[in-house]
Amino acid sequence: MGFFSYLGLVLVGLASLTSLASLANLQDFSTDNPLEEELRCWCQYVKNCRFCWACQDGFCKNKVLKNMPSVQEHSYPMEHCMIHRQCKYVRDGPIFQVECMMQTCDAIHLLNA
């Protein structure tokens, strides 16, 4: 086996490891239970996502935006981006982008159809 063939195999192996590491890094940005230090970023821009709210006795307070008034649980301002109560985040370079698959009003429309 020539030097360049061996080098090619090594590079393919490294590329595979890099892609696995990238997948592991994406799992760090979980939408189910984000890290406390990530909440400021997510909740600033995604005020409708469940993990941004602390609810008790039917009223919810935003965990990060302390000056935001409490809202009634399950009301429109508090509802989640997706009908399955999750938001999907896509890392696009240094920018995190939120993709909400189905807005609450669309979900209600489908349920009433």
Curated annotation (Swiss-Prot):
The keyword Lipid metabolism does not apply. It comes from the Viruses. Keywords: Early protein, Signal. Disulfide bonds: none annotated. The keyword Signal applies. Residues 1-31 form the signal peptide. Induction: Expressed in the early phase of the viral replicative cycle. Plays a role in virus cell tropism, and may be required for efficient virus replication in macrophages. Belongs to the asfivirus MGF 110 family. This is Protein MGF 110-2L. It comes from African swine fever virus (isolate Pig/Kenya/KEN-50/1950).
